[in-house]
Swiss-Prot record:
The record marks 111 as: Important for acyl-CoA specificity. The active site is at 142 (acyl-thioester intermediate), 235 (proton acceptor), 237. Belongs to the MetA family. It is an enzyme of class 2 (transferase). Keywords: Acyltransferase, Amino-acid biosynthesis, Cytoplasm, Methionine biosynthesis, Transferase. Transfers an acetyl group from acetyl-CoA to L-homoserine, forming acetyl-L-homoserine. This is Homoserine O-acetyltransferase. Pathway: Amino-acid biosynthesis; L-methionine biosynthesis via de novo pathway; O-acetyl-L-homoserine from L-homoserine: step 1/1. It comes from Clostridium botulinum (strain Eklund 17B / Type B). One of its GO terms (molecular function) is homoserine O-succinyltransferase activity. Disulfide bonds: none annotated. One of its GO terms (cellular component) is cytoplasm.
Amino acid sequence: MPIKIPTELPAFKVLSNENIFVMNDSRAKTQDIRPLKIAILNLMPKKILAENQLLRHLSNTPLQVEVKLIQTKSYVSQNTPIEHLEKFYTYFDDIKDEKFDGLIITGAPVEQMAFEDITYWNELTEIMKWSKSNVFSTLHICWGAQAGLYYHYDIQKYKLEKKISGVFSHWVNDENADLTRGLDDIFYVPHSRHTEVKKEDINKISELEILSESKEAGIFIVATKDRRKIFFMGHPEYDRNTLKEEYMRDREKGDNVDIPQNYFVDNDINSTPKFTWRGSSNIIFGNWLNYCVYQNTPYDINDISK
């Protein structure tokens, strides 16, 4: 997918070097089509890395996508240069009068805290409330998915005895579902979290359906039947080395964490991790953009409503 981003954004060079089609504003204006407007609320600490990962996955179908990066005002990232944030990010207050075809709410390393204790919780709930009338389809990832299920449906998260970390096999519950179309009977996705949501709680909500799950990692994809809200409990956007970097970070902090499962060759942390989820991740993000956003969003973006 031709993705429209500033040429100065680090992802522009990274993706161009990977032969992914990116374009600047002047090139985009020569294409007489309405681009999909996608906002990304980036709550990850390493924002540039998260940008690269998500933009890579938004670049795989033949539609033009215009991306707007959003940061919280109530909490300023400590791990991303302020110059980068000032140049490429905007605040919710600056875009709340706009409509978007899609919104991605990322994960964040705050899952062991109560939702209400998180510095930017009130701001996040305001954004999620706004998304119901101003965004056609919202994709929530990992902690963002837990936060979305809690806010919209009062579904609780539960602390695990040990952190789930690794790459796990998953199956599809409905082979005809749009979001999982094209996936193999068994496919792989990374998970990295200390908490979970329970299947029985989701099954109580008639508006929701579980589209994919795993014996080891539990629920993966939950979606509303109208596909206006999507929840990924894992991290399909992760790069080859993301789990490795998180594992090393946790060890340096003195956390008692296990080696990520099904990831390192022979569990050797000095080996190059096996990248076994790239194909399935491309399919999943492509399906969201195509079936949940492009095929159903109004041509006139101002017609988006609840």
